[in-house]
């Protein structure tokens, strides 16, 4: 088993690689399930920044894998009985994706991937009744968060070393328990890729 894993890693590193940087916006929904099993409807999606730096490799001529680091703001707003509140959170984590690449000609390609991510909150506040509440001691925010989903990317190769792309990614977190908070970010981003 170790030999197979080593052979796979060596073969990936020997194939074509590119480094990708993207910037964009997360539109994040919070799905809160209380201890009675209800889903309150007072939460509304809000936008936040997305940054990522990743390395992409070819597994074959038309199959890609990537892994990298991400910075995300997963924000949300709402009101209860006309009392407004908001959540502002910053998460840093790791992400990976795997999927096929379809060449459309003239350097244009469409890539669909299955994605997985793990992230942890580095800063978070709730604004409520004209003051801020630190979320670092709230386990629903501060615990390690895993997410799963998919992405679609449209890319254009400018020259053999430089390409540009636009990407849509949808992720869901799956926390279970008597009272849970799940994040559902939809991310729109643009970026540049640098090939070796």
What are these regions (language model features)?
Residues 25, 49-57, 69-71, 94-102, ...:
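Residues on the lipid-exposed face of transmembrane beta-strands in outer-membrane beta-barrel proteins
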Residues 43, 59-61, 104-106, 176-183:
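Solvent-exposed loop/turn segments connecting transmembrane beta-strands
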Residues 16-66, 185-187, 193-196:
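Short glycine/proline- and aromatic-enriched beta-strand/turn motifs that initiate or cap beta-hairpins
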Residues 3-13:
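Sec-dependent N-terminal signal peptides
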Residues 85-107:
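Helix-adjacent hinge/juxtasegments
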Residues 20, 74, 139-141, 145-196:
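Predominantly the C-terminal beta-signal and adjacent terminal strand-loop region
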Residues 30-43, 71-92, 120-144, 175-181:
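Flexible, solvent-exposed loop segments that connect beta-strands
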Residues 16, 58-60, 103-107, 157-161, ...:
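Outer-membrane beta-barrel channels and translocator barrels
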């Amino acid at each position: 088993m170790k030999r197979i894993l080593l052979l796979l890693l060596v073969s990936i590193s020997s194939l074509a690689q590119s480094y990708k940087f993207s910037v964009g916006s997360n539109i994040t929904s919070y799905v809160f399930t209380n201890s009675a099993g209800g889903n309150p409807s007072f939460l509304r999606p809000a936008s936040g920044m997305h940054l990522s730096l990743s390395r992409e490799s070819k597994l074959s001529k038309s199959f890609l894998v990537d892994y990298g680091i991400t910075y995300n703001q997963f924000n949300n707003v709402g009101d209860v009985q006309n009392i407004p509140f908001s959540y502002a959170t910053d998460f840093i984590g790791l992400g990976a994706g795997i999927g096929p690449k379809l060449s459309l000609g003239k350097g244009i390609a469409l890539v669909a991937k299955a994605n997985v991510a793990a992230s942890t909150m580095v800063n978070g506040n709730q604004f409520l009744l004209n003051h801020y509440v630190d979320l670092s001691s709230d386990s629903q925010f501060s615990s390690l968060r895993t997410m799963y989903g998919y992405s679609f990317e449209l890319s254009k190769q400018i020259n053999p070393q430089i390409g540009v792309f636009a990407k849509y990614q949808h992720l869901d977190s799956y926390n279970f328990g008597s009272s849970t908070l799940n994040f559902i970010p939809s991310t729109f981003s643009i970026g540049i890729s640098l090939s070796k």
